[in-house]
């Protein structure tokens, strides 16, 4: 555990609970450990309305933009406007320009050249997961799509997939890189705080501005306007 290293542009937060215990930010040294936390809490971070696929398979053409996404998120927030996201899990210590920016560029190229492989990978995961099957069945009962093939054709072939970067600190440099990309890209900032053997996870939920304070009897599809709160200090 490193407590006071790599403060970045904004410095590290500390969290105090009701009992007065102080939690200090845990600095992940390995991307694999950070990714384990993201996957373990995928439903809370990405949203219970969608499905996270922990799939790591090469897509695209070797030497022509091939890449391996860290995962996929099928966003089912809107019953008639689903969307597929390729997920890139990163540490802020990595090169924002040479590594993260290049990965998103490769995502964009590969989603154009390897659509069928992406679809088949997702289908295979659904076929062996009853939980995903049930969530999709509930979705189909309220949407215009009748089955998983129709849904995946929509989000992969008809619409262009987007990207999500899950990172431990979202800096201005990251947002600058994103502004230069043609692929629609969202950022989720996630961090872990520790106090002895206790842990807390702090994150910016995906599409939180859409579903926060939404009454149970109101469908997200019925919203006419979505107001996104301004980002303060990159969060």
Please place each PLM-identified region on the residue numbering.
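Charged, terminal alpha-helix-loop-beta segments
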Residues: 1-235
């Amino acid at each position: 555990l490193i407590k006071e290293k790599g403060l970045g542009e904004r410095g590290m937060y500390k969290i105090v609970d009701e009992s007065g215990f102080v939690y200090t930010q845990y600095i992940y040294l390995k991307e694999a450990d950070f990714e384990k936390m993201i996957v373990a809490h995928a439903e809370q971070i990405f949203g219970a309305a969608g499905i996270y696929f922990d799939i790591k398979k090469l897509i695209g053409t070797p030497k022509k933009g091939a890449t391996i996404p860290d995962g996929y998120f099928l966003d089912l927030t809107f019953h008639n406007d689903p969307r597929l996201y390729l997920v890139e899990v990163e540490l802020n210590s990595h090169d924002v320009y040479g590594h993260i920016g290049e990965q998103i560029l490769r995502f964009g190229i590969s989603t154009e050249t390897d659509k069928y492989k992406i679809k088949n990978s997702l289908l295979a995961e659904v076929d062996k997961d009853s939980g995903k099957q049930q969530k999709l069945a509930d979705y189909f009962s309220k949407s215009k799509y009748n089955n998983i093939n129709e849904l995946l054709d929509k989000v992969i072939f008809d619409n262009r997939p987007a990207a999500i970067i899950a990172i431990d600190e979202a800096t201005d440099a990251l947002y600058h890189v994103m502004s230069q990309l043609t692929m629609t890209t969202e950022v989720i900032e996630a961090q872990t705080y520790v106090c002895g053997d206790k842990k807390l996870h702090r994150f910016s939920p995906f599409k939180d501005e859409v579903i926060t304070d939404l009454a149970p009897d109101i469908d997200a599809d019925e919203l006419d306007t979505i107001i996104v709160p301004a980002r303060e200090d990159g969060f």
